[in-house]
Amino acid sequence: MRADPCACRGFTLLELLVALAIFGLLAAMSYGGLWTVLEQQSHTEQAADRLAELQKMYLIMQRDIEQVVPRTVRDEFGDEQLPLIGGDTLRLTRGGWRNPAGRQRSTLQRIGYAYEEQQLVRYSWSVLDRAQDSEPLKLPLTEDVERMGLRYLDGNDAWKERWPDTTDFVDNEATEGLLELPALPKAVEVTIEHKNFGTLVWLFQLPQ
């Protein structure tokens, strides 16, 4: 019995080319889909990291601002500075500075906040009354900041762009010529224009 010659016929060159083309197309589609998934995952992780960075920054600012204390300090020139000075930047004296190592230092700390080169930066000094060689520790808290605004709520619930209205101490006749510190604001409002998250408005209540 003679075998059918058609039963042993292999693929033609054209069929092989078509199969290779289909395989290449499927491989390209699979690779493109995988690349898209990986790219989306990377964007998601970056967004999560930026959000965690903002949350950490909020907690740091809350800890600093809500623990402000009415303690003046002296700058590197020996001039007395108010417990809280606010405008486009913010400087304050805060309490509750943890000391787990038990070092011989105060639990009070001088803190500053400023907007510099699309970053919100925190400054901290290791001493309250500084010498001329006292340098602060500079800590960038977040990037991609387009603007930072500060406002201060006074005792009459009116918002002020600066605090206090004057940097001079208030002369109180009842204290027989002694100078009285201006009151601290009731709250500090921080507005941040962020490149990725838009406008963020945070309100911190100060101890009264």
Placement of each model-derived feature along the sequence:
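Conserved acidic
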Residues: 22, 53, 137
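Intrinsically disordered, low-complexity regions enriched in Pro/Ser/Thr/Gly and acidic residues
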Residues: 95-183
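Extracytoplasmic beta-strand-rich oligomerization domains located immediately C-terminal to a leader/signal peptide
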Residues: 29-131
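Short, exposed beta-strand-loop hairpins at the edges of beta-sheets
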Residues: 189-195
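N-terminal single-pass transmembrane signal-anchor helix
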Residues: 2, 7-34
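Acidic surface patches and DE-rich sequence motifs
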Residues: 75, 154, 194
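Edge beta-strands of extracellular beta-sandwich domains
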Residues: 201-205
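Extracellular Ig-like/FN3 beta-sandwich strand-entry sites
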Residues: 185-187
